[in-house]
A protein has these predicted regions:
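A glycine- and small-residue-enriched flexible loop/hinge signal that marks low-structured segments
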Residues: 2-22, 32-47, 53, 66-67, ...
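Soluble or luminal CAZymes and related metallo-dependent hydrolases
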Residues: 72
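Hydrophobic alpha-helical segments
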Residues: 384-391, 420-424
């Protein structure tokens, strides 16, 4: 066996032997990032305080009762059902948790105290039943109900053996006493204040999401969400979209203003987040549960488009999206009407977000900034744009449209590119010659 061996940086080894390096053949590493994530502050009767919880569509359908205190089909879950019509994932924040009170109850004379896991009025729907166990006369069945649904049963001999469940915590010592049912009481919701919304935005800024939504009518809070969106997009480079109701004053490509009912922002947020970069929401059928006010005249719909309003119209028995637009209306030569199209913005945002992610994951601090390194990065970008070309999100692309140059400092890389996003057909102008 040779004395020398291993890998090498330069051929300067002393001992005879084989020194072998294995390297990957150069290939693109990046791909399009995930869409479909909605950040949602919501007033709820149950749930953790001051915390962002992540729920996917499957969890929502199967575990809504355990997580949110209501079953999937309950009326209180309608906003989330609307969001999940399009979203894959929701970053949920209970906006009225702070300042609430937990429901409590005491069972028997030995001091079994039950406290709801979370503050809120839903805790008042919890009931505890203690009954004799039919198989062991020394033990009891302690049953937790929420509404009429049995959610937990524990068979124990003493209070100390009881474990917390998804809805209540048990405290006390000694023997249990049989009771047909003791309801918890005193649960109260907190209030949703401007401070609560600021706290939510502070926390959600650290999360990855596609679309932010606020369903309220408070103008100060709308302005807060508008400013947050503009700061993230323009100062931080995080290309999110925010959906509000009746807020065309934003005049910004990152803010969508819904014209019809305020509660439709939930559906719009889910659809906007879940739409692929090669999809438009124009003429999409509304498949949600709310009654939609579409009683507008033709000229009002025309004005809505000019104002930058996202509107719904009646098409026979269906309700559909009039035009997939945002609030940007202050067109200029360097920023024209294309920027008012949400499909175009989805493409541009995807390019910006994915380019930043690819550079950070695979090139930042890892690849030398010389001609070879910059050529690798260019090839990466070319491959990425070809993915967009293949799904018809962009058109007329060739590799000469991307130029990668050294910057002023040795660490700087400059990229100049030309891109042509596509959009969906919306207007048909047809001339027919009749002979």
């Amino acid at each position: 066996m040779a004395l020398g061996g291993g890998t090498f940086t330069v051929p300067n080894k002393v001992l005879p032997g084989a020194y072998i390096n294995f390297v990957s053949m150069a290939r693109a590493l990046g791909s399009m990032g995930e869409r479909g994530i909605v950040a949602l502050p919501l007033e709820m009767n149950w749930g953790p305080e001051d915390e962002v919880i992540t729920i996917d569509a499957g969890e929502f359908q199967k575990e809504a009762l355990n997580i949110l205190g209501y079953s999937f089909a309950d009326e209180e879950m309608k906003p989330l059902r609307e969001v999940f019509k399009g979203a894959k994932l929701v970053k949920l924040y209970r906006i009225n948790g702070a300042g609430g009170k937990k429901a409590t109850a005491t069972v028997g004379t030995e001091g079994l105290t039950i406290t709801a896991k979370h503050p809120g009025t839903r805790g008042n729907d919890i009931k505890i039943v203690v009954q004799a166990n039919i198989d062991d006369e020394t033990k009891f069945d302690v049953i937790t109900y929420i509404g009429t649904t049995k959610v937990d049963t524990q068979t124990v001999a003493t209070i100390a053996e009881l474990e917390p469940n998804n809805f209540v915590e048990f405290n006390g010592t000694g023997a249990l006493e049989i009771t047909a049912g003791v309801p918890l009481a005193g649960g109260e919701n907190g209030t949703s204040t401007g401070e609560n919304y600021s706290s939510f935005l502070d926390k959600i800024e650290a999360e990855d999401f596609t679309t932010l939504v606020y369903a309220g009518e408070d103008e100060v809070t709308k302005a807060l969400f508008d400013s947050f969106t503009k700061r993230l997009r323009d100062d931080e480079g995080v290309k999110i979209t925010t959906v509000l109701h009746d807020y065309v004053k934003a005049d910004f490509e990152g803010v969508i203003s819904v014209k019809n009912n305020p509660e439709l922002v939930y559906w719009v947020a889910g659809q906007s987040a879940g739409a692929n970069v090669n999809e438009s929401l124009t003429n999409r059928k509304y498949d949600g549960e709310y009654e939609v006010n579409t009683k507008f005249k033709k000229r009002e719909f025309e004005q809505a488009i000019q104002n930058g309003e996202f509107a719904f119209y009646q098409d026979g028995n269906d309700v559909r999206v009039l035009k997939d637009i945002n609030t940007f209306t202050n067109f200029a030569p360097e920023k024209n009407q294309d920027f008012s199209s949400n499909r175009v913005i989805r493409v541009l945002d995807q390019i910006a977000n994915d380019t930043a992610r690819i550079f950070s994951d695979y090139y930042l601090g890892k690849v030398t900034n010389d001609d070879t390194g910059r050529e690798l990065f260019k090839n990466e970008l070319v491959n990425y744009h070809e993915q967009l070309l293949n799904i018809r999100a962009i058109e007329n692309f060739n590799q000469e449209d991307i130029i990668v140059l050294p910057g002023v400092q040795k660490q700087d890389v400059i990229v100049n590119e030309v891109v042509q996003p596509t959009d969906s057909m919306e207007k048909l102008y047809m001339s027919i010659e009749v002979r």
